């Protein structure tokens, strides 16, 4: 049953990754009580994930609306996390913003030199431990 539902879902939402995101958003809506299943009687004993996939496969829910809800929820989550991180410690943000080009170039030069040494070791016939 689940395989046929997923196949029908892929016909509606061609990107499998987007399908997973949409199904998770719909499942979240059902689990939190934000909305009721479209056909409550038919899926009385089924898990919310199966109901979500069925609704997407049968076009019972608007996928554009689901996607917009998902984006909104992600933005709210990210806003909450970033505000807490940098409000409590403004020096962390200042350090990130004051990262100089010189520091970046120095770290790139060091990594390039170590890469060049590995190539030289390979040319000499010695095995390089990984």
UniProtKB/Swiss-Prot annotation:
Comp. bias (Acidic residues): 115-130
Keyword Nucleotidyltransferase (UniProt): yes
Spans annotated as Disordered: 107-130
Function of the molecule: Promotes RNA polymerase assembly. Latches the N- and C-terminal regions of the beta' subunit thereby facilitating its interaction with the beta and alpha subunits.
Listed name of the protein: DNA-directed RNA polymerase subunit omega
Keywords: DNA-directed RNA polymerase, Nucleotidyltransferase, Transcription, Transferase
Taxonomic superkingdom: Bacteria
Gene Ontology cellular component annotations, sorted alphabetically: DNA-directed RNA polymerase complex
A Pfam family recorded for this sequence: RNA_pol_Rpb6
EC number: 2.7.7.6
Nucleotidyltransferase as UniProt keyword: yes
Catalysis performed (reactions): RNA(n) + a ribonucleoside 5'-triphosphate = RNA(n+1) + diphosphate
Residues passing through the membrane, by range: none
GO-annotated molecular function: DNA binding; DNA-directed RNA polymerase activity
Recorded family membership: Belongs to the RNA polymerase subunit omega family.
Oligomeric form and interacting partners: The RNAP catalytic core consists of 2 alpha, 1 beta, 1 beta' and 1 omega subunit. When a sigma factor is associated with the core the holoenzyme is formed, which can initiate transcription.
